[in-house]
Structure formats: C-alpha cells, structure tokens
C-alpha cells in the first residue's frame, strides 16, 4: 500500500470516522491501529516486523532508564551507557545495511540482503536517536506509555518518507485528541490535492524523460544531458515535496500539523542557503546530532571544515551504500567550503561587473549558478554509478547541440509535445506559487476567504486536471516515491 494507492485513502477515511467517533482521550488509538495496519501492509516479511519491534522496544526502554539515571537512581555514567546502547540498537540495522551495500557493491558488485530491513528504517532510526538524545539532555520527558511511544514512531503519514519529526514537535499533537473541524478537514484536502498535482503533473512526467536519458546515458550528450539534469532536479524536488505535502494534508485531517520539509530550495543564492531550504528536517537533524556534537564551527576553520566533510559524508551514506551517494555528500561539503573561502574575491568580481550585493540581477545570477551546482550533484546522485555520473557531466560539456530543441528529438524520449506542454505549465504554476509564498503571501488563507462556489470550482477543476493530464492522461502509471527507497 503506497501513498498513491486508493486503499491508502480508504484506510484514511475509515480512520477518520473511527477517530472522531471515539472519546477525545483515546482518539490516538485510532491512529495507532491504522499505523500498525499500514506498516504491516508495506512490510514484506515477519523479519522486518521483528527488527522494527525490537527497535521500538529498545527506544522506549532506554528512554525510561535514561531519565531514571538523571534522577540519580543509576547515575550519569549509566545514563550515557544506556543512551549509547539505545542509539546503537536503533542505528545498527541502518549502518549494517548502508555499509554492507558499500562493501558488497564495491568488492562483489552485488547488493546486500535489503529485504530483511524494515520499511522506513532510515527515517525512524533518526527519529529514535533524536528522542533518546533529547531525553538525555533534559529537553523532553520520556513517554511512559509504550503504545503512545509506538504511535510516535509508527505514525503512518510519516513512516515512509518523513519529515523526521522531534518528539517535542509531534508527541502531544498525536495524543491530545482533536475536535472535528470542517475547515481543518478542508485544509487537509487542499494539501492532498496539491500533493497529487505535484506528483502526477510534474514528478511522474519528468521521470519518463529522465529515465530514458539516464538509463541510456552512453548515447546522449550536450543538451540532452543538461535537460535531463534539470528535469531530474525538478522531479526529485516535486516527488519528495508531493509526498510530504500529502502527509501534511492527511495529518491535518486529524488536527495534526507537521513541520515543513522544504522552503523553495531552488530560490537559494548559495549552497549553504540551499541546505537551509532542502529536506529541512534532515538538515536540522544532521546539524543537531552530528555537526554540533563534532564541535560545529567553534574550534577554528580547519576543524569546522572537517566537521562539514564528516556531516555531509554521513548524509550521503544515509541516502545509500553506494560511492555515488558519498561523493554527492562530499561534493556538497566542497561546495560550502569553497563558497566560504572564495566569498570575498567572488563578491569583488561581481561588484566590478556591476552586480552589487542585493540587486535583483545579482540574486538571479547567484540563484542560477547555485541551481547549476546542485544539478551537477544530482546527476551524480541519479546516475547508475559514480563513474557513469562523471561521464554524463563530461558528455554534457562535450557537445553543443541546440538543434535538438527544434527537430523534435526531445519528443522521442517518452514524452510527446502535449505532455511537455503540460509539464511546462505545471512547473510554471509551481514557480509562481513559490514566488508568491517567498514574498510572504499566504495563498491558502486567500483561498479560504473565497466563497464556496469559487472554492469548489477550483477543487473540481484540480481533480479534473489531475485525472485528464496526470496519471491517466496519456497512459502511464505513477512511479514510486523516490525517497521511499532511502
């Protein structure tokens, strides 16, 4: 059962009915039942469920005993040992998976036995580490009810692709029991519809062209690679954003508000800013639980740069046990270090080129350049291997073939002209919406102030557009959410 499947939404409707029928104090039980059912339905075997159950039990038990250690029943040394044990048990399957993949792919050119690993491992492991660490530092109290703790870890809109939620942000929202609110329900539906549009009108369409080029990269060069790189940058963003948006919408049906995971990352004027806008829950987790514990920027520039390299290497390994992912992470570390070292000379050159800091043209140039750097890293990320990614980037610069824009070559890679037009218009709409939000305009508030006729006309038109021009429009099926594979 995936977030794009009809049974998923049938489950949501049944869950919502049960949730609002139950007394407020026990409404969280409806979420727990559905979360358990959903996780069981997406798991391939009982071994996965057993590993997942051990992780939940370890996280819950260690949280209780860490707190008791702070209350001087066991002492601080014991608390540290318990914290370490809880973290090791939580992340060991993840480390074994990623490092095992890295070893087997490098040496034997085979993949590890990923079939035994629990679904959502990369996300709930980080959530557990944050939970235990925050208890140790006294930021939160441990959850004493194991069923409530289980709900925190397994909450079904989050378990596959996040966002990675902290207990102090999510915990009480899950357990308090929210009142039924028509407006809240409609706000949730708005987000779900917007998520569908991002997925079916942009991400899935872009995937067709992207797959055609990346799967046969040896025969393409020049603008073919550039366009595929741009479209993959858009595909990955809208695919992940759509899943998070749908998750936020589903959660709002129950009165639960999830943290945002993106803030228009391709409007960034530097790589540093990009990581403040991209996958924000992961960026915050890496900052708080890897970068800062390593010393952050408090111990001189050399140590700061080493900490950045380690942090981004961890980020790369988190995405997968392949050298291409680690190189992708290290490349972003290099971008940040180079950006900081070269900031003054670059600023001097741009000032001399009549591009003063703060000017619109300067911002545009920096946005384009940052997006180009990010796109090159995404090519490595998407390619079948590090070697293939490097070859694609070389091929992109090896030939200038502008004629493909006019001889219909682009329309022979899975997308006809009409599909390209739909994709272009959908990206244009996303860009316009993002630009308005960037200026502080709250589109949903404006929308909710309109009369019922206008609102329902937009709802029905959105569904019609998705139905005609999205998944069903030209005979192709929805692809899996990309980040579900990490």
PLM-predicted stretches and their roles:
Residues 1-431, 435-485:
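Membrane-embedded transmembrane alpha-helical bundles that form the catalytic cores
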């Amino acid at each position: 059962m995936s977030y794009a499947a009809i049974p998923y939404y049938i489950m949501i409707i049944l869950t919502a009915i049960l949730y609002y029928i139950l007394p407020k104090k026990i409404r969280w039980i409806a979420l727990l039942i559905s979360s358990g059912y959903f996780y069981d339905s997406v798991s391939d075997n009982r071994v996965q469920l057993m590993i997942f159950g051990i992780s939940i039990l370890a996280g819950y038990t260690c949280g209780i005993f860490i707190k008791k250690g702070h209350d001087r029943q066991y002492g601080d040394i014991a608390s540290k040992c318990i914290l370490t044990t809880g973290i090791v048990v939580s992340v060991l399957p993840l480390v074994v998976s990623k490092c095992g993949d890295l070893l087997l792919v490098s040496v034997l050119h085979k993949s590890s036995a990923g079939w035994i690993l629990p679904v959502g491992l990369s996300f709930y492991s980080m959530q557990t580490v944050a939970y235990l660490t925050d208890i140790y530092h006294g930021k939160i109290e441990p959850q004493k009810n194991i069923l409530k703790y289980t709900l925190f870890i397994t909450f079904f809109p989050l378990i596959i692709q996040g966002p990675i939620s902290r207990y102090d942000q999510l915990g009480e929202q899950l357990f308090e029991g929210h009142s039924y609110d028509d407006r809240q329900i409609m706000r949730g539906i708005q987000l779900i519809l917007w998520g569908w549009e991002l997925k079916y009108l942009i991400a899935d369409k872009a995937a067709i062209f992207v797959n055609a080029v990346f799967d046969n990269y040896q025969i393409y060069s020049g603008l073919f690679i550039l366009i595929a790189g741009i479209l993959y940058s858009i595909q990955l963003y809208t695919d992940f954003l759509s899943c998070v948006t749908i998750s936020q919408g589903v959660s709002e049906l129950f009165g639960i508000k999830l943290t945002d995971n993106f803030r228009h990352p391709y409007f960034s004027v530097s790589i540093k800013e990009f990581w403040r806008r991209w996958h924000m829950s992961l960026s915050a987790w890496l900052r708080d639980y890897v970068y800062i514990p390593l010393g952050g920027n408090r111990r001189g520039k050399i140590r700061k740069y080493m900490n950045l390299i380690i942090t981004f290497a961890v980020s790369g390994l988190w995405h997968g046990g392949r050298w291409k992912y680690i190189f992708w992470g290290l490349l972003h570390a290099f971008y940040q270090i180079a950006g900081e070292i070269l900031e003054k000379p670059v600023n001097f050159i741009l000032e001399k080129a009549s591009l003063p800091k703060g000017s619109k043209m300067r911002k545009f140039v920096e946005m384009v350049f940052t997006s180009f750097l990010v796109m090159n890293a995404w090519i490595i990320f998407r390619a079948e291997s590090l070697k293939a990614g490097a070859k694609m980037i070389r091929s992109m610069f090896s030939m200038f073939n502008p004629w493909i824009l006019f001889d219909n070559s682009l329309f022979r890679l899975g997308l006809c002209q009409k599909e390209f037009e739909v994709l272009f218009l959908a990206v244009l709409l996303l860009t316009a919406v993002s630009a308005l939000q960037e200026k502080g305009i709250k589109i949903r508030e404006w929308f909710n102030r309109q009369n019922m006729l206008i609102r329902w006309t937009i709802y029905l038109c959105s569904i019609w557009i998705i139905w005609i021009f999205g998944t069903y429009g030209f005979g192709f099926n929805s692809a899996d959410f990309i980040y579900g594979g990490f």
